């Protein structure tokens, strides 16, 4: 398939888990009726975002929320990137994305490897590591193209995107919830940088903005092409963002500016230490 439609669901998150899941499934169905073949939910789609919420809302995978995602992926015959949920496993908590195929099978599970610990004086202090543990593995899976997964803060680490490109990824998806400090400064910049550096499509799915929340998400779910152009971008409100992923266009860009062939592997390397 030379091109396919991607949909990003910028969901308004409430404190009621079941409502979040039900509404997410409704938007997934709507996206499928509009021709989306791959659909992504935002980071922490089933719960408020915050260290005090992660233990309360944590689930096993498979579990109640991911079972609903499996069912709707099969119903709609789509690839579904399940944003992320707080996952509990063996006494530890993770920020985890589950991916489902068109037959409802669990294709992949990715645990955020770079935890969001920052301190910007007078602006924001946040430590995911207070309650979460980091993952320790990469995640790629095959759809109409090969997809690489990261979650939010992972996008700041160029090495992750480079390794995904080396592994043949043509689309990188980052469910994420930047904030009102980092969002306006870095959200689009990082996406365009990752896209141009690695000649890939980059997509981000954010929660919709809720100014009354303890953590206010930036919103602006986005799709960027390998030329660094913004193809589609939401505002701050609840929305579905659609974009056609053109693999022929990607191949043309890689042929026109052949950086992969021109890398000086005799002088430098970015390598994967662990599969």
Curated annotation (Swiss-Prot):
Keywords for the protein's UniProt record, in alphabetical order: Acetylation, Cytoplasm, Hydrolase, Phosphoprotein
Residue positions where N6-succinyllysine is found in the record: 68, 123, 130
Any single biological process term in GO: asparagine metabolic process
Record PROSITE patterns: CN_HYDROLASE
Entry's Gene Ontology cellular component terms: mitochondrion
Substrates-to-products reaction catalysed: 2-oxoglutaramate + H2O = 2-oxoglutarate + NH4(+); 2-oxosuccinamate + H2O = oxaloacetate + NH4(+)
Location of the protein in the cell: Cytoplasm
EC code(s) of this entry: 3.5.1.3
InterPro entries: C-N_Hydrolase, C-N_Hydrolase_sf, Nit1/2_C-N_Hydrolase
Gene3D superfamilies associated with the record: Carbon-nitrogen hydrolase
Residues that bear N6-acetyllysine: 68
Domain CN hydrolase: 4-247
Enzyme class: hydrolase
Active site: 43, 112, 152
Pfam families: CN_hydrolase
Coiled coil spans: none
Phosphoserine sites (modified residues): 26
A single GO molecular function term of this UniProt record: 2-oxoglutaramate amidase activity
Similarity-based family: Belongs to the carbon-nitrogen hydrolase superfamily. NIT1/NIT2 family.
Quaternary structure and interacting proteins, as annotated: Homodimer.
Function recorded in the entry: Has omega-amidase activity. The role of omega-amidase is to remove potentially toxic intermediates by converting 2-oxoglutaramate and 2-oxosuccinamate to biologically useful 2-oxoglutarate and oxaloacetate, respectively.
The protein's name in its UniProt record: Omega-amidase NIT2
Originating organism: Pongo abelii (Sumatran orangutan)
The organism's taxonomic lineage, starting at the top: Eukaryota, Metazoa, Chordata, Craniata, Vertebrata
């Amino acid at each position: 398939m030379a091109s396919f439609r991607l949909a990003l669901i910028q969901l308004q998150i409430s404190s009621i888990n079941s409502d979040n899941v039900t509404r997410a499934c409704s938007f997934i169905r709507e996206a499928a009726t509009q021709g989306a073949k791959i659909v992504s939910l935002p980071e922490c789609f089933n719960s408020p975002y915050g260290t005090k919420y992660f233990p309360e809302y944590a689930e096993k995978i498979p579990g109640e929320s991911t079972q609903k995602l499996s069912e709707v992926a099969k119903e709609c015959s789509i690839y579904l990137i399940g944003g992320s949920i707080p996952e509990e496993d063996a006494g530890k908590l993770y920020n985890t994305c589950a991916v489902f195929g068109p037959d409802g099978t669990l294709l992949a599970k990715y645990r955020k490897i770079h935890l969001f610990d920052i301190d910007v004086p007078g602006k924001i202090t946040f430590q995911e590591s207070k309650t979460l543990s980091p993952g320790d593995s990469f995640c790629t899976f095959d759809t109409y193209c090969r997809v690489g997964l990261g979650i939010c803060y992972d996008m700041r680490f160029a090495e992750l995107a480079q390794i995904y490109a080396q592994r043949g990824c043509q689309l990188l998806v980052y469910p994420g919830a930047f904030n009102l400090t980092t969002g306006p400064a870095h959200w689009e910049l990082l996406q365009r940088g990752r896209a141009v550096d690695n000649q890939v499509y980059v997509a981000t799915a954010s929660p919709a903005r809720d100014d009354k929340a303890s953590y206010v998400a930036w919103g602006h779910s986005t799709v960027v092409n390998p030329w660094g152009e913004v193809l589609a971008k939401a505002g701050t409100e609840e929305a579905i963002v659609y974009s056609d992923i053109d693999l022929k266009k990607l191949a043309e860009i890689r042929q026109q500016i052949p950086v992969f062939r021109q890398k000086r592997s005799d002088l430098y390397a970015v390598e994967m230490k662990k599969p």
